[in-house]
Amino acid sequence: MTPPLVPGFDETFNPYPSGPDGTGDLEQAKAKLAECGQPDGFSMNLAYVNQGLGPDLFASVQQNLGRVGIKVGGAANDGSSYYSTWIGSPKNIIDQKIGIAIAGWGADFPTAYGFWQSIANGNAILDEGNSNYPSLNDPKVNDLLAQLTKEGDKAKADDLAKQLDQQVMANAVYLPVQFDKTFYYRNPRLTNIYLNGGVGNYYDYVNVGTGGK
């Protein structure tokens, strides 16, 4: 789950393999459904933004989960309130019978704490504008996050970060489906142009000038 540039990333860690060809392990999925008392599948809704890639993502998940009997309905919402009161409201998640919510996330700072604090800390769950979409409240996760704020030794902090990633994934509440990379083009005529971490690692347009060659 942890992105490649954040401490805790381990490309060998894959607790939920999706078959040899990456298209899904149907037999294992059916076995897990039987194990939890739902051998014929179940019904739930998937939350998504009703524009851009949202409808296509919904259709893809609906089709793929349907292969093992899981019936997926849509819980679409406008992008303007999607993160604040749609999937950002634990009550609305329950009211809309949302079992999966499509969301994007990135660390404000490239640290394990910066990546996980808002989306995995059970002490940070809000009534609205909540970023811990599954309302995960695992004491082990909370404790690892607390330890990260105090650990000054990099090697020990990196080990805590790996433990944190593995503990979150043990709860099976997040499914990483895509890691975005953005290509930035800088026109050679621009001067004093740089990425500002304070504005989300975007160009700081306030200080941009022209006159370059």
Residue ranges and their predicted role:
Residues Q62-G73, T191, L195, Y202, ...:
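C-terminal amphipathic alpha-helical "assembly" element
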Residues L33, Y205-T210:
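Long, contiguous, secondary-structure-rich segments that constitute the structural scaffold
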Residues L57-F58, A112-F115, R189:
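Short, solvent-exposed loop/turn and secondary-structure capping segments
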Residues G129, Y184-D204:
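A structural "hinge/loop" feature
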